[in-house]
Structure formats: C-alpha cells, structure tokens
Amino acid sequence: MTIHYVDASAWAKLLVDEHESGALAAYVDERLAAGETFASSHLLVTELHQLAARVSAAPTDVTAVLSVLALTMPDAATYRAAGLLPGSVRSLDALHVASALDLGADDFVSFDERQLAAAAAAGIPAANPSNALGDST
C-alpha cells in the first residue's frame, strides 16, 4: 500500500482555490482511484481550521477535505523524534516529518520547499504534485 503524507501547504489547496489547486486535486484523484492512501497528522486538522477562519471557509469544507485522509495522532516518541531531526526545521514541519516517518510514508506531498528538504533529509522522497503532472509552477 502506497502512503502519501501531506502537509498543510498541500492540503490547503483543496480548501482554498490557488494556482496549484487543480493539479493537486487531479494528483489526489488519480492516486485515490489507484487505491493509494493519503495521510497526515492531526496537526493538519488545526492548521486547516485556522486557515478556514482566516479565509472565511466553512468548517464543513474543512471536514470534507479531511475526510479522505488517514490521520495519525503524534505521541511522545514522535515529538522527541521531531526534536532530533537534522537541520533547523520549524516545529510544526518537524512534527509532520516525524509523523510521516512513523507512518512509513512512501513520499511527502508539499508545496513548501523547506518542508520537502526536511522530509528528504529524513529519508522521505519529496513529491510535488505540480511537477508530477507537468505544471510549470
């Protein structure tokens, strides 16, 4: 089973219409149809609800975009692992990378280059849906 770990920079594009939103939606649809899994940490729930409040999106929209994800709850070991990741990674980014490691994610889906670099440094291949689908961004 293929597991694609996603962060807020990616999944937010399913909530807010941005340039890469169409590419991400196509990427997700294609992989879900193939039986692949998208996953994230429960941190994403907070991140998306905060985003929704900032852009006046309905909480039901957040629930809808979260509904296709397998969500994991970071435990104390995940927090410790996040603190020990190499480089100077922002705290939430480190928690996402550590959560992806816990899940055994096959790749890390993000539009945040620093986040992708942190994932790659931890041994998780980076995935950028725009690049995968031939978008020029």
Features from the language model and the residues they span:
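Glycine-rich, small/polar surface segments that engage phosphate groups of diverse ligands
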Residues: 41-42
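N-proximal accessory regions
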Residues: 27-31, 46-87, 128-130
